[in-house]
Amino acid sequence: MTTFSPIPDSFIVNNNCIIKSNPKYDVLTYQQLLDLKKLTPENLKKEWDKMIKAPSDKNRRTFVGNKILYHFQFEELLKTKRDIKDYKTIDEILSNKELSKKWIDYAIKLNRNIKKPYLTSVDIFECYRLCKGSVVFFKPFTTKYLCTHFKATAVLDPCAGWGGRLLGARSLGLEYTGIDTNINLKKNYDKMLELYGGTMLYENCLESDFSTINYDIVITSPPYLNIEQYSHMPLFQSESDYYKDFLIPLIKQC
């Protein structure tokens, strides 16, 4: 006999969560999904303390710091589409009754957490990205480890993305300069810079003057063709164009 976990006090049945055994299909919303990834100031500080204290002598399998990235950049991440036929964003799914019902039913069938009798919009998101793939973060700890291993003092990140490398570098107190064309990220990057430090430039990295930037290591995660389609970034017309006009010039410039 399965012993079910209690529903947390913060979840109200048929308000922000639904019961698997008797689901209501008009309850879960996109805004709930965004809200569930937000941290209180106290929890934000706890996550940052974990990031600072995480030992970086070995490249451990850890997602420390990811909750901070979800807190700040989740909404823009959810707007990013993948180059998959009929790909829908989670906002499009939860805003469409037919699609929402389809994925709620599938999440119930998948039943990833048997002991949990309820579903939230996060469960629908996790189910969808498990099936369709998802846009993911560069783990902050990976940057922390690389900087420790190579004894870096200043990081250049010409394709800054969601902020994982900023967190990794700043958790060691290192200088960090990130570059990105996605101006939609600026509002929440400004909040991150205020808390953790670092510098962000919103421009095409191929047009940046790297000679004016202090760095002794480059750690970045450039887009690969059009697999992930970001705001304010034109699509590459071909694989040849991607290498010839973007990746190779970027590597040479670094």
Predicted features along the sequence, with ranges:
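Class I S-adenosyl-L-methionine-dependent methyltransferase catalytic core
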Residues: M1-K67, K79-C254
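Intrinsic structural disorder/low-complexity segments
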Residues: F74-E76
